[in-house]
Regions:
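Alpha-helical transmembrane segments and their immediate juxtamembrane cytosolic regions
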Residues: 1-170
Length: 170
């Protein structure tokens, strides 16, 4: 979503659709129906960012309402720290100046640590893996063309949950 000047509602609609498709499989592997899968975390964050970036205050209340509604549903998807990390990622991708990048980078790192705050070693490992991935991808990313097709992540996520659901039911 950060590649474009603004978040497109058509992209979000597709993401909401895949989140619904994946939710069925998410329930099959044992999560309660009210626990949203990670695609919902992406969709909620993207929708809120789209609404608050509109020039009118008209969308502020729905954005706040969506965030509040997501809180009890987000326990299986990194909670509000996940939303904070995704928001910090979006802001970091849009940063124009070094001070902005530094500030949003620190915020992003804190959010990654908070996503696994129940275990310090998991928090540090999560941050280390994320930073290593960023370093590798940023140094090789300009030379490598897109490997997977568009929408691969959301399709793969939904299909892998379905496969896990089938395995669990055997």
């Amino acid at each position: 979503l950060a590649r474009h000047a603004e978040i497109r509602q058509s992209q979000l609609n597709s993401l909401w659709g895949w989140a619904l498709v994946a939710q069925v499989s998410f329930m099959l592997i044992g999560y309660p129906w009210y626990s949203g899968n990670i695609l919902f975390a992406f969709a909620v964050t993207g929708q809120v960012l789209r609404w608050v970036s509109q020039p009118s205050w008209y969308y502020t209340l729905p954005a706040a309402g969506l965030l509040v509604a997501w809180i009890p549903l987000s326990t299986a998807s990194y909670g509000m720290a996940g939303v904070g990390m995704l928001t910090a990622s979006w802001l970091l991708c849009r940063a124009q100046h070094a001070q902005e990048r530094l500030g949003y980078g620190v915020l992003w790192a804190l959010m990654v640590l908070l996503m696994n705050m129940h275990d310090v070693s998991e928090s540090v490992a999560g941050l280390a893996i994320a930073l290593l991935t960023l370093m590798v991808c940023s140094s090789a990313g300009e030379r490598v063309k897109r490997f997977w097709p568009r929408q691969f992540f959301v399709m793969f996520y939904a299909v892998h949950l379905a496969v896990l659901g089938i395995v669990v039911s055997m």
